[in-house]
Amino acid sequence: MTNALFQPIQLGNIELKNRIVMPPMTRSRATQPGNSANDMMAAYYAQRASAGLIIAEGTQISPMGQGYAWTPGIYSDEQIAGWKKVTDAVHEKEGVIFAQLWHVGRVTHPDNIGGEQPISSSALKAENVKVFIDNGTDEPGFVDVVEPREMTKEDIKAVVEQYRQAALNAIEAGFDGIELHAANGYLINQFIDSEANNRNDEYGGSIENRLRFLGEVVEAMVEAIGADRVGVRLAPFTSLNGTVDATPVETYTAAAALLNLYKIVYLHIAEVDWDDAPETPKTFKSAVRNAYQGVLIYAGKYDSERGEKAVAEGVTDMVGFGRPFVANPDLPARIQNGYPLAAHDPNTLFGGAEKGLIDYPEYAG
């Protein structure tokens, strides 16, 4: 029997060689000053180009969009040139790579955004959330986030425009497409989830209103670069970074239906993945399948067996394997051949240099 993970699949105008996705993972190794992607990052992604699709780590669309020290941006000429090194290296290995466009909203600290106050849907501080800043050492310094200010309508318009420009910048940098990060408690998620949004204008209250900002951003990016190059990531059931929705099934089924109207090329659902996390309800997965007609990606707690089963049963079209890709640059070959997986070193995930980024070997037998 052929493993369903190794069937090719059409993603817009691109044929992908398999259904294995390297999902976005922050590694905090951008060149300083300037937060630019670099040769080391190019080597890292090129090593993993056997994935059907690579979604690069979140890249902030503006200086205000940065939540953590040393993450890459995509708003300056220097940053576009840095990412071009990455996309060229991946394309040389016949890989396909999308950029993940990121604005953290309230999940930051003034030290990461030039001393400014963070912005969000509402002036609600994310409770019990820390981010890391550059404290002058090689180790990230963790600090509590601060209360944001509520975005004005002018702020909203400006950020929609920043997303549009970032999408254009990503194509200029050689990316095959972009993924809008609307998950994990960051800015767009702060509008979507009821408990993070207490606005009383057209961007708050009802599900339709809370999805309005998402729709405006997607519409701007689709107009700029085409729907066949735009994907979106959602996280319906996570409470990461302090965002919670009171009715996640209803909210996120409506989000899937909205995104279907824009004919985006894929919808990427991040499932809760801590050790004893509950399973995503099957009823929700089938509701999403019915609401959204494009390529579906699920990521979170998948091993090769579970991933293959999900694709074979039609629950999803592609599967993201996050942490396994850190220590296994040749993950598709290891899955296909039943080779053992290496474990990653958690101490080298964020910050630092080559160690823990590009020194994990391929399987040697």
Question: Where is each model-derived feature located?
Answer:
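Flavin-dependent oxidoreductase catalytic cores
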Residues: M1-G365
